[in-house]
A protein has these predicted regions:
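Short beta-strand segments
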Residues: 62-64, 134-136, 154
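Short, acidic/turn-prone active-site loops that include or flank metal/cofactor-
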Residues: 94-97, 112-119, 136-140, 156-160
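Hydrophobic/aromatic beta-strand patches that form the interior of the parallel beta-sheet core
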Residues: 91, 109-111, 134, 152
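N-terminal donor/sugar-recognition subdomains of glycan-related enzymes
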Residues: 1-87, 98-103, 107, 118-131, ...
Length: 181
């Protein structure tokens, strides 16, 4: 989108670039998204709305992968071993869930969003760790179905089948922003 680069308004430019990423991602992965959605819906998992009571009023720590994670493990562990633990909800992305568990850090939830089957490695070996899995309705169904613990599905805006299902079931729709994080 060379013409977008000419736009001086940074907010508008960023909005258009995010739209482009979202649009092309949905178009490129459309068949995977539909297959994953259909497979995931057939699991009849509870909806993520059911965990609201476990999160409301708490400080939420979302742990994602990145270069600073290694430096923060000790601090994170200290916070989670403190008296404040009951006031904290920890959600981690699938990519680092095993690393946290290896470091004796137990998140409250593991979240997976990626539609690609190749992300199965993210939860390999921890499928029965006892931590509930939060997943987008279009997340890789091979990852979701292999997880033997409690699972909660989330429906996202921008995917028509998810929007319809959320409307039928009266569930919350989430804006995912076209990005994994």
């Amino acid at each position: 989108m060379p013409s977008v680069k000419a736009i001086e308004n940074n907010e508008l430019k960023e909005l258009l670039e995010q739209y482009k990423i979202s649009f092309f991602s949905m178009e490129y992965f459309e068949n995977d998204l539909i297959r994953n959605f259909d497979n995931n819906i057939s699991l009849n998992d509870d909806n993520i709305d059911d965990i609201r009571k476990n999160v409301i009023g708490k400080n939420v720590i979302l742990i994602a992968a990145g270069p600073s994670l290694e430096n923060e493990l000790v601090s994170l562990k200290a916070v989670l071993e403190s008296n404040e633990r009951q006031n904290i909800c920890v959600i981690c992305v699938g990519k680092i869930s095993r690393k946290l568990l290896e470091n004796k850090i137990k998140p409250d939830y593991i979240a997976v969003t990626d539609a690609k089957d190749s992300t199965r490695w993210q939860i390999s070996g921890i499928e029965d760790c006892g931590i509930p899995l939060l997943y987008l309705s279009t997340a890789a169904s091979n990852v979701v179905s292999s997880y033997t613990g409690k699972r909660y599905i989330a429906y996202q805006n921008g995917f028509e089948k998810a929007e319809k299902m959320a409307e039928i079931k009266k569930n919350t729709l989430f804006d995912t922003g076209g990005s994994v994080a």
